[in-house]
């Protein structure tokens, strides 16, 4: 299939959107998947934009109404999502959608209606000549060099454990936890507030995210870590105004919520339990392959110590003499996009694209027949 330009790959996350041209090692553009609209006429009167996206919306968020087109992994505002996709083509990539195919990512268990609407929008609204949709966890697995394994994918909006056999997601084994990076940032704000550190405004959020990403870690044993003297745990952080704050048990209490969601008053199993549950829902002959190939993906799996703690907690409940291995690829923040870049570049993949002619003939239902 010949086109004027290389395929575009878009990883549509709840927190960040990643976009670039297939064949590249990294996405050319990564920014917040948010849209800001002016409050009243103040910015418009000053010559500012009435609508802005990504980093620009983030920088102005205190004076804007902020909306998230994707929540908990699913598109909730189709109008805003279309604005975002058009922005990627027009202002970031500076490409015409009609000149080449696009590969878009989706979470496991994406509702059928959502899949159809995404397909429809790319063909009818953006006018792409060819399209494909691929599950995020499958792409992360490809990027790690595997075709079979259990992917624990935790980004900004949702955490999923997804068993994959020979490149195909096993939907009956997928488990989901509605707790991820955005929730952990909110939780860290609360933990710091409880220690008298008030970083609660919209503009403070970026600071709290930086603290989370720079200093938070997962304890091998939460109770033992809590028993340590505060001096042994202390980290200092300098705020933009020069003030220095001291941080202690908040740094491991925050990501502990991934293992014990009850800390955030959420009645749900933690990541160790959803991984175990996913594996046990699969055929007995596949379980050892999954226990020994647990692949981490997404920014919220990047906390130091998370991989070792996951091995420890899963090994406790796994059948006797079962090898448990967790693989933590260093590039896991972008591994979903990387997998899409690899897949869309393969010569063997070129016959997989849904063409505009096929869409016209079959309709949006074609996505269920071709993308799974």
From Swiss-Prot:
Interacts with PFN3. It is found in: Cytoplasm, Cytoskeleton; Cytoplasm; Nucleus. This is Actin-related protein T3. Gene3D superfamilies: 3.30.420.40, Actin, Chain A, domain 4. GO terms for cellular component: actin cytoskeleton; cytoplasm; male germ cell nucleus. InterPro entries: Actin (IPR004000), Actin/actin-like_CS (IPR020902), ATPase_NBD (IPR043129). Keywords: Cytoplasm, Cytoskeleton, Nucleus. PANTHER family: ACTIN (PTHR11937). Belongs to the actin family. It comes from Homo sapiens. The gene is ACTRT3. Ubiquitously expressed.
